[in-house]
């Protein structure tokens, strides 16, 4: 087989949706063939009213006239849609690398003609995804780019970089309440544009995945919202450090003196620094959660015994970090499917290579790899990709850390691994 071919794993039945802000409209400016997947997805997800297309012709490419046509397309959307959008995302595909659209001039024209509306330009170029900022980082940043600085801070905390609700069984929310956080905000949970705008009033951003790091960095620079990086982890020591970092950030931000804080003189609304009683309650909740998860790890370890375990990058954002954690708990990790490797997993990747040299690493660019590895048929496969390729009977259905954080993530994973021992997944 050709060595330049890569695996493509079909995820039948799993809907593909794009994160967006409420009351927004996506306008794709590109040649017709560039948005076939986007338009098919819109039909499948019934989101046709939230997007439109401005197709470029050869004359547009030659003259640059499409820049003025964008404003006309916005005007048409405002007059024809049942609910006029509050914000527009202008998507420019990879052809813009050759056209060189004057983004600032385009935004100035749109904001001048349509005051009170939000506008952002999004560049979509998968061909250049390996250079500089990835498309995912840039798109995620644009989602928060319409937030405006506010003179007031409330007690809320934003979770950045997540695409799905963290489960109600997660200790994070009770711990936050103990620290005086009245609301945990997430972009996809915003009911309307005003709720989206309130994200700018939050006192702290907690970044749960690398894809949100660039957005949080820019929010810290533009809006003055400090951030704590706390990517989903399955290592108990790292989870403890993350909670200490979040608590420390909330305590530092909470230094209220006569209604103002030390950060750029912004006023706070009815919030005080966490008290010792609040710290004690948070510590109790965290100790309880940690004790529960240590019991869960012990039960799963006893149940699995020497059963081989395979970790997959479709299940978690940092597969080598998960492999390191599981190996540390005593599980028999035999392989890591790194079909979607990320740089933020590099340190753990090096650790696995040095400390657990027997672990096989499967990458998407090699068809021959799987055929020669002789991976065990009875392995517990954590993630769809490895389970699908191996037609594994024991399948742990986790997707990109969705719904998971802190000690709850480890506890739920242990429960799923135990359940997978009796699994009998049948593949087409």
Annotate each PLM feature.
Residues 1-428:
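An N-terminal assembly and electron-transfer interface module characteristic of large anaerobic redox
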